[in-house]
Amino acid sequence: VKQLKTRPANYLLRLTHHPTIPSPLTLFCLREAATASTTYPLTSPTMTTVLTPQIDSLQTSLEAKGVKYALASYVDIHGMCKAKMVPIAHLGQMMTGSELFTGAALDGVPQDVSDEEVAAMPDANSATVLPWNPEVAWFASDLYLEGRPFEACCRGILKQMLAKATDMGFTFNLGIETEFFILKENLDGSFGPVSDRDSLDKPCYDLPGLLDNYPWITEIVDYMNQLGWDVYSFDHEDANGQFETDFAYSDALTMADRLTFFRLMVKEVARKYGYFASFMPKPFANRTGSGAHYNMSLADVNSGQNLFENPNDPLSCKLSNLGYQFIAGVLRHAKAICAVTCPTVNSYKRLLRQGSMSGFTWAPVYICYGNNNRTNMLRIPLAGGRVECRAADISTNLYLGAAMILAAGLEGIREGLDPGEPHTENMYNYSLEDLKAMNIDMLPRTLQEAIDTFEADPLSKTVMGPLMYQTYIDFRRQEWEDYHTHISDWELKRYLKFF
């Protein structure tokens, strides 16, 4: 009882889920905690193990499909899955927060070893049976601490921003173009494409390269369609061993859950075939990097109507005034956004005009927008009605990236910002002097520069909250320092015998 009166939430959670504590004691603890004077209100749904009809129905449905285990999964600062596995008979407990995690054991979770554990609260709507292992179901989860939403939960940060969009009457819809590498490791420790024929300087849309990878890529596509994601296209991309899948957009939270699951699924399928999947932004200096272009629109929260559509757009982009205001907000905060949508040291080796044997990197370099023109940071595709952010790579933590870019876009709408005229020309052809005269700035050149602008932009703390804001800065700065103090092979080759 003494512990309950000081820190009841997680302690009570342990009691109510403890198999050896008699029911009367559990009830006594509940009564004492309810009357205790505490700064931790007992409002969390983690305080009960009662199976609601929804959870009971879900468990029955999963058991009928042959599911034996469930995963309470969440992401760390990288957007990588972390989880505990629970027998399906204990699904009710898992769904009410029984699975606790020590945050100090993870990257970018701001907790000390002496802190209380965070509890994973699974979202029943995210239940996904693993297509490659149908005995297991995966659940995206929010993190709770002391009975309250954990401030540094990536999924929770996105949900808070989506709630603000809802208050303004909007649903944020999002589609992601998933680019990635599937590679094999050779006996000498080197790695390269699966197919020996995948060696062209311009391998984009290469049919032999696609057909040689038919078994694993069609297995992934079949799984995606089995899950209801509606894949409408997939192809060999512009680098050897690189591929892209395109599937239907959804609301932003669902898409963030799906991208998280997608990366897990692709890695598992590739491993089955003896290969490995890489979501590193640019693994080869002379090849195109892997993007994760954000295709964005706002819909009316009640009718679902796309509010970015305007077939009579005087600027000929088929975009509404609301869409242009959204663009202006994103451009205003582009550098800070880049620190999250391009989160690694390696990310900035993708954001170059040159650096691919195919002739182009296809990546943005400047903070500008335009029509169906891939040299802009923000592109409005030919059909209009949506905005594509090209300054995002496949290593992105989509929960955080979507939250940042949505916040910027909503600011543009609230303030009625104007992005100016769209750029239809090849932006790669301009010199720095030309761009300066046009008042067009460059995207960050390094992670250090991106984090500096992220730290200086007030929007970052507003979106992330003070705890995650500082954690993100500290973590990425340390990543930069680790890289900056490393002596590379390039340096040794260039300088060791030269001086």
Question: Each predicted region: which residue ranges?
Answer:
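Cationic, low-complexity basic patches in intrinsically disordered or flexible, solvent-exposed regions
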Residues: Q3-L4
